[in-house]
């Protein structure tokens, strides 16, 4: 069996695969990693594959908890028919690359891949397999947190998302969603301009995917655990 680990900025997701079948999965906050070694210790593992954008001490703790050979996955210049045009793949988060590889399996046309977690990443992938790069911006929670910490009067709960906010709490909620949905829409527009084709499908993943989806006027799929899907693709080669 193969253990796949996606170590994000705030949480760790993992899944156990027998062939193409997911037989077990779980998640933990960074402060809850101690229990994972006990969970994984008795599993009949043949190997483990990890993508990490977490702090080094988190990645090291996960590596120590894995009771079998561990493969740390990084972004590459090419995988299959996907070509990575990132200037320096060594500085690119593996999670972004793996999400693109998974999206390629789901959609063979032009696609925008949006991962909505602690940060929002918005990637552009053409039907020809050219991964053009993408955006990184603060996620929903981080955006509101930065306003609370960086201003004198905005440390308050966000309200409702409305078209024309007439109160500060609604303005916070609406502004955050407008920024996130707007970034996705703008990359979709840019990709259509680049290719000369119809605007792309959006594949949306991450903890805030459902929060953003209602505000996107685009054909879309919400896909859970997209990074783990990409890890499985790499592990099976």
Swiss-Prot record:
Protein's UniProt keywords contain Kinase: yes
InterPro entries on file: ATPase_NBD, Type_III_PanK
Residues given in the record as ATP binding sites: 6-13, 118
Major location category of this protein: cytoplasm
Cofactor binding comment, as recorded: A monovalent cation. Ammonium or potassium.
EC number: 2.7.1.33
Uppermost EC category: transferase
GO molecular function: ATP binding; pantothenate kinase activity
Gene Ontology terms: cellular component: cytoplasm
Catalytic activity: (R)-pantothenate + ATP = (R)-4'-phosphopantothenate + ADP + H(+)
Pathway of action: Cofactor biosynthesis; coenzyme A biosynthesis; CoA from (R)-pantothenate: step 1/5
Cofactor: NH4(+); K(+)
Active site: 95 (proton acceptor)
Purpose: Catalyzes the phosphorylation of pantothenate (Pan), the first step in CoA biosynthesis.
Similarity comment: family membership: Belongs to the type III pantothenate kinase family.
Protein name: Type III pantothenate kinase
UniProt organism field: Chromobacterium violaceum (strain ATCC 12472 / DSM 30191 / JCM 1249 / CCUG 213 / NBRC 12614 / NCIMB 9131 / NCTC 9757 / MK)
Designated gene of the protein: coaX
